[in-house]
Amino acid sequence: MRLTQMPSEFQKALPVLEKIKEAGFEAYFVGGSVRDALLHSPIHDVDIATSSYPEETKQIFPRTADIGIEHGTVLVLDGDEEYEVTTFRTEDVYVDYRRPSAVSFVRSLEEDLKRRDFTVNAFALDETGEIVDLFHGLEDLEKQVLRAVGVASERFNEDALRIMRGFRFQASLGFALEPETFKAMKTLTPLLEKISVERTFVEFDKLLLAPFWRRGLASMIESQAYDYLPDMASSQDKLNRLFDLETDFTFESSEQAWAALLWALEIENAQSFLKSWKTSRQFAKQVQDLLIILALRENGELSKRDCYRFDIDLLLQAENLRQAQGKEVNPQAITEKYQSLTIHDKKEIQINGGILIKEYGYQPGPDLGEILTEIEFAIVDGELENNREAIHAYLREKK
């Protein structure tokens, strides 16, 4: 099969392919970018595979960087563009179900493609637009099927993260998992405990943000993979609550997706849960804030102080999630209340602790903090104007 129209992303990278071929080596576009081109989907990263060894690749191009040379990858700088150029390779026995004990560089494209995870990710594309399809990936693409390359159990034993990647690809593509492939995934889910939490988080996060997240999540639940994810053992019934969200709902952000997950799991302490997933503190705080906003909305409308406390983006994401839960929402009222606030940060207050100490004789300590907080909320509540004269009058009354 030949592409009738080479996508612009590939056209831009053609000079790199051509230089490698002029030097006497093979070179192809490979991986997800080729699949996306066939599906007429946006192309993100253009990866190149070649028969040239890393040192040979570096001799072809004047500007390169070693970013993973032990695995055969050289970063080629071409004008303003950067391309990862990786030598065809085979991989030895995997250790810890995560990484090969050794990588061997080879001159054979077929040997390289054999180690790929799924047939729809095992294409190669040459400079003429010809598709190299050694594992019937085009047929699987047509049938919308995710099938492991070769023996499925071997692929997942090599790198157990491929199990999560399978669920994630199902969520992003909407494809069905081929029965033998899914059977192997279900059998080998205990291996997920061998995978770093950070890598697992990335795949689960991409699954939740994908357009067909329901399909990927349903397969993950059926496989009982959740039993081997941090703090999610025996959570099938609770995870199924996510399917109660509106049928066409997709998550706006990672924070919203994980807030929904914790809502489904009935977990109130996001910081503790997400610490197990080794996320950033900032991410955990925003997820926690979303859960707090959802809880506040269960008790009625948000107050001015509520709107002041949280970022408007989080307030609206929480409202969006409430709508997906089938609850009454009023994003316009929340936006108007937020915009009506005199201040959105205490740094905007026209006085500070230094002024209170200098002009009013306050001493550093709890009393100073209390009066500053009192002023802050009086301004937020609309009871006090945010100017020095009004604040001074307020303080004189207090004195």
Swiss-Prot record:
Top EC class of this enzyme: transferase
Signal sequence annotation: none
Positions of disulphide bridges: none
Alphabetized GO MF terms: ATP binding; CCA tRNA nucleotidyltransferase activity; magnesium ion binding; tRNA binding
Cofactor field: Mg(2+)
Annotated CTP binding sites: G32, R35, R116, D159, R162, R165, R168
Keywords: ATP-binding, Magnesium, Metal-binding, Nucleotide-binding, Nucleotidyltransferase, RNA repair, RNA-binding, Transferase, tRNA processing
Pfam families: PolyA_pol, PolyA_pol_RNAbd, tRNA_NucTran2_2
The keyword Hydrolase belongs to this UniProt entry's keyword annotation: no
Record InterPro entries: Bact_CCA-adding_enz_type3_sf, CCA-adding_enz_C, CCA-adding_enz_firmicutes, NT_sf, PolA_pol_head_dom, PolyA_RNA-bd
Top-level taxon of the source organism: Bacteria
Reactions mediated catalytically: a tRNA precursor + 2 CTP + ATP = a tRNA with a 3' CCA end + 3 diphosphate; a tRNA with a 3' CCA end + 2 CTP + ATP = a tRNA with a 3' CCACCA end + 3 diphosphate
Quaternary context: Homodimer.
Family: Belongs to the tRNA nucleotidyltransferase/poly(A) polymerase family. Bacterial CCA-adding enzyme type 3 subfamily.
Function field: Catalyzes the addition and repair of the essential 3'-terminal CCA sequence in tRNAs without using a nucleic acid template. Adds these three nucleotides in the order of C, C, and A to the tRNA nucleotide-73, using CTP and ATP as substrates and producing inorganic pyrophosphate. tRNA 3'-terminal CCA addition is required both for tRNA processing and repair. Also involved in tRNA surveillance by mediating tandem CCA addition to generate a CCACCA at the 3' terminus of unstable tRNAs. While stable tRNAs receive only 3'-terminal CCA, unstable tRNAs are marked with CCACCA and rapidly degraded.
Name of this chain's protein: CCA-adding enzyme
